[in-house]
Structures are given as structure tokens and as C-alpha cells.
Amino acid sequence: MERNLRKKRLGRVVSDKMDKTIVVAVETKVRHPLYGKTVNRTTKFKAHDENNEARFGDRVLIMETRPLSKDKRWRLVEIVEKAK
């Protein structure tokens, strides 16, 4: 698979308690099929953070990668914005 064809997601770190792993919550807006209201959907991804640099509340960019563990298939690309 080409490196630039891999999916990328922008989200917020909701947990950094594991070693070399962060949990990133990604929000997407979806229109309800019947009522048409825009609804926020949240999906959590476990991502590999090699240097343990991301902290709780940071906005991060993650990229799809090969399976690294049972449920880790993403890795940290960059920290877009540090938490205050």
C-alpha cells in the first residue's frame, strides 16, 4: 500500500496512561437519514506513540498503519496543538 494512500484522522487525545499508546477520539458529523439533523459521532482509536510525547487534551494527527497489537492499527504523525 502506498504511504500517501493511508487514511489520516484528526482527533483529541482522551487517554495517555498506557506505555507508547494513546487513545484518540475522532468526531465526525453525520446527517440522520430520516430526520436530517446533524449528529456528532465519536470513534476512539488506539494509536502508537513511540516517544510518549502526546498528552491528554492534545489535538493530534494519526495515520493508518500495519497492525501493531490486538487493537492498535494507527500511529501518531504529529501533535497539531498542545493542550492548555
From Swiss-Prot:
One Pfam short name: Ribosomal_S17
Keyword Oxidoreductase: no
Domain of life of the organism encoding this protein: Bacteria
Listed SUPFAM superfamilies: Nucleic acid-binding proteins (SSF50249)
GO biological process: translation
GO molecular function: rRNA binding; structural constituent of ribosome
The keyword rRNA-binding appears for this protein: yes
Protein keywords: Ribonucleoprotein, Ribosomal protein, RNA-binding, rRNA-binding
Listed GO CC annotations: cytosolic small ribosomal subunit
InterPro entries: NA-bd_OB-fold, Ribosomal_uS17, Ribosomal_uS17_bact/chlr, Ribosomal_uS17_CS
PANTHER family: 40S RIBOSOMAL PROTEIN S11 FAMILY MEMBER, SMALL RIBOSOMAL SUBUNIT PROTEIN US17M
Subunit composition and interactions: Part of the 30S ribosomal subunit.
Family to which the UniProt record says this protein belongs: Belongs to the universal ribosomal protein uS17 family.
Role: One of the primary rRNA binding proteins, it binds specifically to the 5'-end of 16S ribosomal RNA.
Protein name: Small ribosomal subunit protein uS17
Source organism per UniProt: Clostridium perfringens (strain 13 / Type A)
Organismal lineage: Bacteria, Bacillati, Bacillota, Clostridia, Eubacteriales
